UniProtKB/Swiss-Prot annotation:
Segments forming domain DEK-C: 1799-1854
Organism: Aspergillus oryzae (strain ATCC 42149 / RIB 40)
Cited PROSITE patterns: CYTOCHROME_B5_2, DEK_C, MYOSIN_MOTOR
Name under which the protein is recorded: Chitin synthase Y
Domain called Cytochrome b5 heme-binding: residue spans: 961-1020
Transmembrane residue ranges: 898-918, 937-957, 1209-1229, 1603-1623, 1630-1650, 1657-1677
Signal peptide from the UniProt entry: none
Protein family according to the UniProt entry: In the N-terminal section; belongs to the TRAFAC class myosin-kinesin ATPase superfamily. Myosin family.
């Protein structure tokens, strides 16, 4: 085969074997040209002898050769190779491997499918189809569309076909195994531009029915849409899915919908239950939905008990929230979780930093990364779950497998990192490097060794050897991946990692360069970016890898939060996903149930069958290979056996979990070991791309030549020309095959040489060695007559060759081949994954019928979820908690009475309505809503009553009268800006409005104006007969009634009847122009349009007129004057020319009526009128006459007693309020010099609770406390860190920030000790660490004690965090137990020890405690002033100062608070301080008296206060508002309640500055808390009997007024608006008293800041007044309505059996006995016994309670403070610490020798010594350096172990150990 073919017989391109080309054509260029010539005639393949195949991707069909058949096609060649391998498998019993090499897009996946289908077609078992389905599922889950191909593999595949050895010729397929290596997880959340994520996600989106989409939540318009229209299932391609790349990627020529049906079918064929398939689809939907979650920063305005921190936190800390709650609820439903807990889990992440669990509060970007991590984890676990289940269904028992065929296909070489994951790129390239190295070994080294042993000499061939790169990357122990893993495990930094790489590889390995030299900036300096990178010279080119983020990525840590969250899932499937072996967990060493973190294994779950076998049959050897070193944890590969996985975990306990690189490395080693096995025969398929642009049938010589060079094809071809040996046969076997017998005489070697001479095989294909014969595969086949053997090919339907057989791809396309699932009638089938016209592939035509899918319609066509729970049901199930009864509670009488009132007020609202519309599933939450609603009703009623009293009450008591006295009428004369009014017959009209409309308009307005303010009755004579019907129904028209004005003092100025203008209005009968109804019509019109009121006559004035002989009286409030009538003012007159009729009756009024006015003038005649003996008709007629002729006005009652009462009642209330304001003002004016107190000798504790504040805030607060002008020796700074939490914007946990400020090094790590906390259930057990020392700042040296709440080991999320109240309780409970000499918890005993023995002060000495928030800065003299005031008045139990704002001008929100802060302190608190009862001592700046000065009786820490304040069961609305909203106010309430004889005071001279909320949402939340807690606390105070004062001057009355004013705050603004509107409508009556009161309130406030010279407050006051609507209306109403907005926790009270009230919780039941307690004396005695130490020398008791082990760092002299302890003048503490350092050291050594329980075991030390020596430079390493390194690793002093360390080191070095 070496020689060239005879010229002219066949064209050059017909030669398929490259080694057969002439020697001068063996260069890269010539071989490329030869490949091109074949490519252009439709022959895209070539061979490297029988061992390798070269295939060029045509980007068209891979199954059509030049003549249209498969001959010459890639598929044909693949089938041929498979047939040869299968033959060899049967004939020689060798394991076979087909290894694919090539770049992404070269067609490896397609050819792999052809090879697999060929192998499966050789077997007739039903297993063949199962294996094809399994392969399809693997591809569906792990392939994607990249820039270079539609089917890019993104996971390494080791596909194993298992055969038994019963038949020597045609082995039987008995099983298979899919071993996946390292899925590219990063692609899930980071889809590169122009590429897709994994195909299955697109299948799901496209292939589900409308009903299924609805169930999965795909039909919601929740996703960002690029088109404005509504999203329908048809427009699904236009939705923007974050995890699916650009919307254009949804349509790329892949039939996704069909792919989904095939995916479901494949799962069904592999016996996955329908319900499980539906669950799988739900989980895939979850992944898509997680991508859609939108995060934003918000405030945790829902109050929870765990909140902590200062004023700026009170409105709710900044948290990350999910904006699209509907998407979140879909995710929660499918995962079986509660919506709130899932949302909460995104906003934080728990990490382990320096062996401490820390919760990091995440911003929206961090939450997005957290969500991405969740998506990656779920997808990885789902893939692992599906593949493991597939393997369970296809894998044969290991001991029955005789031989295997392995198909190895790893992703192609990656020059750039497309998904942003350096780790994925590095591991993928490392695998490619390893496989290529194996290829080179197979062709070169492996054969060379054996040829040398057999004394066969062949010419050497030079080739590019990539061993340096392989060794540099993959060497066990000190290869790059091993170092990466080791550095990750040890928690090294990136800089340390870079340094390690430099030490290892610089000038030692040419393939790896650390800190690429090329990246300089012209200055000669290497850039930071270049320094943090390394370059690997791969066989396919150099690649730069960034170190940035690599260590963290390699850890691939799944936080414990996620694991614990998934523990609570209600979904069995999700529980199963997170319970599989693919998920490795790390548990806490002390609490095995607590999962610290987890990791999705980067190792496959299964091992190849060959790797599990201890030895191979010797007789079947081919070429010997250097045996691969057995990896240490070979057996525990992926935790395949329970025993081994357990072993691995125990090994990890010391070193931590193996990283991705370490796992991948060990799995690669196993692959390499299997492939390098002597009993395995490898084949290689080199897949090449003809061009880089995916253009069909175009050959780019440059592109192909580069690939030919990369893979060293020319060198391999040359090597095969020299030595193409594939089989080695010992002489006996060779001769047996050659059937030589005894014909030839001689030795076996001579006989063999004779046979070779006869065969005339070329020398490079057949050679005789010293013990056997080397043959090429062709020669062996010829010899063994393999061609005579028939390899059967089976078809799925049993049809002939022409039919479409199972996995027998005839017309499949490249990149689109392999796939067809349904019958061949559909020409477009198979495009679902590979595009193009393919027709055949994974599945045979008959395999897809419905024979095994009985009732399969639900799966394939309808709704696969119809038998599952709905999303709503799942969500409800996920929100439920597992509860257990933990306690029984009595219900108080007051509670029962209150609930009766609540139900009375809310009975009409049915419970189901609250459940349905309010979405309140829990009964206690619904009850709280009812309470809230009842309280709101009461408040609204109070407001309504207040409004009623202000507005409606005066009107009811004294109805408004529109009457004008004579003087008032006269004042409306149109002069000096007054209106113009005029009166006619007792009715007042608006002359101003009338004048412009006066007819005729010739009369000038000035003439009319002179009548203003006058009675114009005289101008309008009346026709009596038209206005009155008389006694009998008619009056003669000639009868006239004269009008006589009443000119008496007090009556209106009247116009004479002789006025010039009177004649124009005279239309009486006797005039020539008679219009009897004119006056009535005019009056009607005037009343309708211009009426202003009536002339008013007071009862007194009517009496006065009567005395002056006026016949005047009132009936029903109307005043009638009959004087003129009675005095004879009646006459008759007829028109000119007519006579007055005789006997005209001028007496038209009934005598009885007249007599009333004659006999009873000046009186109210209403009763007499009613009693008149006249008929109804007469009464009506007389009433008409009175109204029309004698009416002069109405009775004016404005000065009556009832009206006076109404007026002065409101005034009295106003004056009372004003008096309170004046009192407050007087209280605020506390002038006098600010005397600077003298030095004081009282011991004080300065307490700062820290939560998630930043370093600047903490440093400011602590420094201000330390720098207070108070004797440093007598103050103790106590910082209580509430949980291991990294706040947003912080780079370290808060405790670490605090310790760094105080100067405590990280090496100091005390033991966490138990103590009781405030929490639900088991959360009552908490653990804390105690640190103490000295803090030096600006010349002050202050002792400090830091309490760090770290939580129990089982706490994963927010470990230790229990809230601000709990932080206060830590110190309160400790001091309480100190003063009452009660048993203490371990942590409290440690606190006692640290304070007494380390700091040197007995804890009972401390008399005062100053509580300051972490965002508050105190003035230097404030502490001294507080103590001085408390000494001056020993009855003071609590005292607060004035708090100002440090961020006054930061935002509009802070600006409106400045004045309010000033006034609330200087008015309200100062006023309350007068009574000695400040009702709210703010927690941000208050000093409390710990014990009384005289009797030492505990006050602040008395039993009653501590017990009440440590209430754990906070389950009612009232208790929630007291303890979760306003714990500071409630603490004050408790002090007033339990110590009524003591005072709480305000001291304006003591100053502090805090931070006010800057955003409106936080401000709103903070004020909601304050207002609601105020209401509930004042309700608590009102019943107290002991509040000082008497009657209205009592504090109780003030409390009631305060409560009322809080409730009816909105009314005050409403009243001001009412006054303004009143003024706008009617400025004539100004409510002066109201304005005087308002002016007094604000005027007095202004005086305060004027007297205080706070001139800037004038501006702030204006800002405040503009914000009045917010403070007076918006805040109260918002607060009252949101009174029940809490995070309710999971503990609740329910009605149990027999009506008992029982508490249930999901936190478990707390057993107080789980925390051991001892009195200090007992504890000290135990220490004394243990150490034989004298009691007065108890400093030595540096034993922690938990372990009795000594902590050297905690000794008086050794504790690292912010300055060296030796400079500290100990004696001035008056302490007993006089122990000499030398004695201390010797005692220290003695103690260590006595108790070594905390030291590591000898085995652990030995393991670490081996590890150190394995990587150490033996030329420089010393025993001392080894001991120091061990101490650093274990974190303890190992002096006691020095002899063992020295001996063990020597033993390891000498090989004895």
């Amino acid at each position: 085969m070496v020689g060239p073919s005879p010229a002219g017989t066949v064209p050059s391109h017909a030669q398929s074997s490259l080694p057969s080309l002439p020697a001068h054509l063996q260069s890269d260029t010539h071989l490329t040209a030869h490949l091109a010539s074949r490519f252009h005639v439709g022959l895209p393949t070539a061979r490297l002898s029988s061992q390798a195949l070269i295939s060029l991707n045509t980007y068209t069909s891979s199954s059509k050769g030049p003549d249209g058949g498969k001959e010459g096609s890639a598929m044909g060649e693949a089938e041929d190779l498979a047939r040869r391998a299968f033959t060899r498998l049967g004939a020689r019993g060798e394991n076979q491997a087909i290894v694919f090499l090539g770049e992404s897009g070269a067609g490896k996946t397609t050819l792999r499918a052809h090879v697999l289908s060929s192998f499966l077609s050789f077997s007739s078992t039903p297993l063949s189809s199962k294996l094809s389905y399994a392969s399809f599922i693997f591809d569906t889950l792990t392939t994607t569309k990249s820039l270079t191909t539609l089917t890019a593999s993104k996971a390494g595949l080791f596909l194993e076909l298992q055969y038994d050895g019963s038949s020597s010729v045609n082995p039987t397929l008995i099983g298979g195994k899919i071993i996946d290596h390292r899925l590219e997880r990063s692609r899930i959340a980071s889809v590169p531009t122009g590429e897709r994520s994994f195909h299955v996600l697109y299948y799901l989106l496209a292939g589900t029915s409308a009903a299924e989409k609805s169930h999965l939540g795909f039909d919601n318009s929740i996703h960002v849409s690029t088109n404005a229209g509504k999203l329908s299932s048809a427009s699904i391609g236009h939705k923007r899915w974050r995890y699916l790349g650009h919307p254009t990627q949804l349509k790329v020529g892949i039939n996704d919908a069909e792919g989904f049906q095939h995916f479901k079918t494949a799962l069904r064929k592999l016996e996955f239950p329908r319900s499980e398939i539906a669950e799988i689809c739900q989980i895939l939907a979850v992944i898509l939905h997680i991508g859609q979650l939108d995060f934003a920063s918000g405030q945790a305005t829902l109050t929870s008990a765990e909140e902590s921190g200062g004023y700026s936190h009170e409105g709710g800390e900044t948290v990350t929230v999910v904006k699209n709650k509907d998407v979140l609820s879909s995710v929660a439903a499918f995962l079986g979780l509660g919506v709130d807990e899932l949302e909460n889990s995104f906003s934080y992440r728990t990490k382990t930093i320096h062996r401490e669990r820390v919760t990091v509060m995440l911003d929206p970007k961090g939450a997005r990364q957290n969500a991405d991590e969740l998506a990656r984890t779920i997808y990885s676990l789902l893939v692992a779950y599906i593949l493991e289940n597939v393997n369970q269904r296809i894998c044969a028992a290991e001991d029955s497998v005789a031989n295997t065929v392995s198909i190895v296909d790893f992703p192609g070489f990656s020059q750039a990192c497309s998904t942003g994951s350096t780790l994925d790129q590095l591991l993928s390239n490392a695998a490619t490097e390893s496989l290529y190295n194996f290829c080179l070994q197979s062709f070169f080294d492996r054969k060379a060794d054996m040829l040398e042993r057999e004394e066969v000499v062949v010419p050497a061939t030079s080739y590019f050897d990539n061993t340096d790169a392989v060794r540099g990357l993959l060497k066990h122990g000190n290869g790059l991946l091993s170092i990466l893993d080791d550095q990750t495990r040890r928690g090294r930094t990136e800089a340390q990692f870079a340094e390690s790489l430099k030490k290892r590889f610089e000038n030692k390995n040419p393939a790896i360069v650390v800190g690429s030299s090329g990246s300089t900036h012209g200055t000669g300096y290497v850039s930071q970016q270049a320094r943090s990178a390394f370059t690997v010279k791969h066989f396919a080119g150099e690649v730069d890898y960034s170190i940035s983020g690599l260590l963290e990525e390699n850890g691939e840590v799944i936080s414990g939060d996620l694991m614990n969250l998934m523990k609570s899932t209600r979904s069995d499937f999700v529980r199963e996903l997170f319970g599989q072996e693919a998920l490795q967990t790390v548990t806490h060493p002390k609490e095995k149930t607590a999962i610290m973190q987890a990791q999705v294994s980067s190792k496959p779950l299964r091992m190849p069958s060959m790797a599990r076998r201890k030895a191979s049959p010797a007789s079947r050897l081919t070429f010997d290979a250097p045996t691969a070193e057995e990896p240490e944890d070979n057996e525990s590969y992926g935790g395949s056996t329970a025993k081994s996985s357990g072993r691995r975990k125990s090994a990890m306990s010391m070193t931590g979990m193996q990283g991705a690189a370490g796992q991948f490395l060990s799995s690669l080693e196993i692959v390499n070991k299997c492939l390098s096995s002597p009993s395995l025969n490898p084949y290689f398929i080199f897949c090449l791309k003809p061009n880089d642009r995916r253009i069909a049938n175009q050959f780019d010589s440059k592109c192909v030549r580069a690939q030919v060079q990369t893979f060293g094809i020319a060198e391999i071809s040359q090597r095969l020309r020299n030595a193409d040996f594939s089989v080695f046969l010992p002489f006996e076997e060779f001769l047996g095959l050659a059937e030589v017998g005894n014909v030839v005489v001689g030795s076996d070697k001579e006989k063999s040489e004779v046979v070779l001479d006869e065969k005339r095989w070329p020398g490079n294909e057949a050679r005789v060695g010293s013990t056997g014969v080397f043959l090429s595969e062709r020669c062996w086949a010829d010899l063994a007559k393999v061609g005579e053997r028939v390899v059967p090919v089976y078809h799925a339907d049993g049809s002939d060759e022409g039919g479409d057989g199972l996995l027998h791809p005839r017309t499949a396309g490249y990149g689109d081949s392999k796939v067809r699932l349904l019958n061949p009638a559909d020409q477009s089938l198979g495009n679902f994954i590979y595009g193009d016209e393919s027709k055949q592939g994974y599945f045979g035509s008959r395999d897809i019928d419905g024979r095994s899918d009985t009732g399969g319609s639900g799966l394939n066509s309808g709704d696969m979820f119809h038998n599952l729970e709905t999303r709503e049901q799942m969500l409800e199930k996920g929100n439920e908690k597992k509860m257990e009864e933990v306690d029984e509670v009595p219900v108080s009488g007051s509670r029962k009475r209150w609930m009766a009132i609540v139900w009375l007020l809310t009975f009409y609202i049915p419970d189901f309505a609250i459940r349905l519309f309010g979405r309140m599933k829990r009964k206690d939450v619904r009850t709280a809503w009812r309470e809230k609603f009842a309280i709101n009703l009461i408040i609204w009623f109070s407001c309504a009553v207040a409004i009623f009293f202000i507005v409606a009450f005066p009107g009811l008591v004294c109805p408004t009268q529109h009457v004008y006295s004579a003087a008032e009428l006269e004042s409306h004369n149109g002069k000096n800006g007054h209106d113009s009014y005029i009166a006619i017959r007792g009715v007042v009209f608006d002359l101003d409005k009338f004048m412009p409309r006066h007819y005729p308009d010739i009369v000038p307005q000035s003439s009319l104006k002179k009548y203003a303010g006058m009675d114009a009755t005289g101008l309008f004579p009346v026709q009596v007969s038209a206005l009155c019907q008389g006694k009998d129904g008619s009056i003669d028209p000639t009868v006239l009634l004269d009008y006589t004005p009443t000119n008496i003092s007090g009556s209106a100025t009247t116009i004479s009847t002789g006025d010039l203008n009177a004649k124009y209005h005279d239309f009486r009968y006797y005039t020539n122009d008679s219009r009897p109804d004119w006056f009535a019509e005019q009056m009607k019109e005037l009343r309708a349009t211009y009426l202003k009121g009536y002339i008013g006559y007071t009862p007194q004035y009517i009496s006065t007129l009567a005395k002056k002989s006026q016949n005047i009286g009132s009936i029903d409030g109307k005043v009638y004057d009959l004087t003129t009538y009675i005095s004879g003012g009646r006459r008759v007159a007829a028109p000119t020319g007519k006579e007055v009729p005789a006997n005209v009756d001028r007496e038209f009024m009934d005598p009885l009526v007249v007599s009333l006015f004659q006999d009873l003038p000046g009186q109210d005649l209403s009763k007499h009128w009613e009693q008149l003996q006249i008929d109804a008709g007469m009464r009506d007629r007389m009433q008409m006459c009175l109204d029309n002729l004698f009416f002069v006005g109405k009775v004016d009652t404005r000065n009556s007693a009832q009206c006076q009462f109404a007026r002065y009642f409101i005034l009295a209330i106003s004056i009372l309020i004003c008096a309170v304001v004046i009192f407050k003002f007087a209280a605020a004016l506390q002038f006098g010099k600010k005397n600077v107190p003298e030095n004081l000798d009282k011991f004080i504790i300065c307490q700062v609770p820290a939560y998630t504040e930043d370093e600047e805030s903490l440093r400011r607060a602590m420094d201000s406390m330390a720098r207070m002008q108070y004797d440093d020796k007598r103050k103790l700074l106590v910082v209580i860190c509430d949980g291991m939490i990294i706040g947003q914007g912080n780079d370290r946990p808060t405790p670490r920030i605090v310790l760094d400020i105080l100067g405590v090094p990280e090496s100091v790590d005390p033991e966490p000790l138990s103590f009781e906390s405030l929490g639900e259930g088991m959360k009552q057990h908490n653990m804390g660490k105690i640190y103490s020392g000295l803090y030096e700042v600006q010349g002050h040296i202050v002792p400090f004690l830091v309490v760090v709440k770290v939580g129990k080991p089982s706490e994963v999320s927010r470990p230790g965090n229990r809230g601000k109240r709990d932080s206060q309780m830590v110190l309160m409970r400790f001091l309480n137990r100190v003063h009452y000499n009660l048993p203490m918890s371990p942590m409290e005993l440690e606190m006692y020890h640290q304070i007494r023995n380390i700091i040197g002060v007995n804890p009972t000495f401390y008399e005062f405690i100053l509580q300051v928030d972490a965002d508050t800065v105190v003035a230097p003299d404030s502490g001294t002033r507080f103590v001085a005031s408390c000494l001056a008045d020993t009855r003071i139990i609590g005292i607060c100062g004035e708090t100002g704002l440090t961020n006054a001008k930061h935002s509009a929100v802070t600006m409106i608070q400045v004045y309010e802060y000033f006034i609330s302190h200087n008015l309200i608190k100062a006023f309350e301080s007068l009574f000695g009862s400040v009702t709210c001592l703010p927690g941000c700046f208050t000093m409390y008296r710990i014990r009384s000065a005289e009797t030492a009786k505990p006050l602040f820490v008395s039993k009653e206060v501590v017990e009440a304040y440590s209430e754990i069961r906070v389950d009612t609305l009232h208790m929630k508002n007291l303890l979760h909203l306003g714990e500071d106010r409630y603490l004050t309430t408790l002090l007033l309640k339990h110590h009524p004889s003591f005072k709480t005071k305000f001291l304006f001279a003591a100053k502090a500055w805090t931070i006010a909320p800057e955003s409106f949402s936080v401000f709103l939340s903070q004020r909601r808390r304050w207002i609601n807690s105020t209401v509930h606390n004042l309700i608590e105070l009102i019943p107290l009997q002991q509040l000082c004062g008497f009657c209205c001057f009592s504090m109780r009355f003030i409390v009631f007024v305060d409560l009322l004013s809080t409730c009816i705050q909105p009314v005050s603004l409403a009243y001001i608006i009412y006054l303004i509107v009143w003024l706008a409508r009617d400025s004539s009556t100004i409510p002066w008293t109201s304005f005087v009161l308002i002016a007094a309130i604000y005027g007095l406030q202004a005086l305060i800041f004027i007297f205080r010279r706070k001139w800037e407050m004038i501006g702030w006051m204006i800002v405040y007044l503009l914000a009045m609507p917010i403070f007076s209306v918006a805040l109260p109403f918002y607060s009252f309505w949101h009174m029940d907005d809490f995070s309710w926790g999971n503990t609740r009270v329910i009605t149990g059996e027999k009506g008992r009230k029982v508490v249930i919780s999901d936190e478990g039941k707390f057993d107080p006995a789980s925390i051991p307690k001892k009195r200090w004396e007992e504890y000290q005695a135990e220490l004394w016994e243990a150490q034989t130490s004298r009691d007065d020398r108890s400093e030595v008791s540096g034993f922690s309670y938990g372990t009795k082990s000594y902590h050297p760092a905690q000794s008086e002299y050794g504790f690292p403070g912010a300055r060296p302890m030796s400079q500290f003048d100990l004696p001035r503490y008056g302490s007993r610490m006089s122990l000499a350092p030398s004695e201390m050291m010797s005692r220290h050594m003695d103690m260590e020798m006595e108790d070594l329980s905390h030291l590591p075991s000898d085995d652990a030390i030995l393991a670490e010594i081996r590890e150190i020596l394995r990587t150490a430079d033996l030329m420089t390493v010393t025993k001392k350096s080894i001991k120091q390194e061990l101490e650093r690793r274990f974190g303890v002093n190992l002096d006691a172990k020095r002899p063992y360390i020295n001996s063990a080191t020597e033993a390891v070095l000498s090989g004895a150990l």
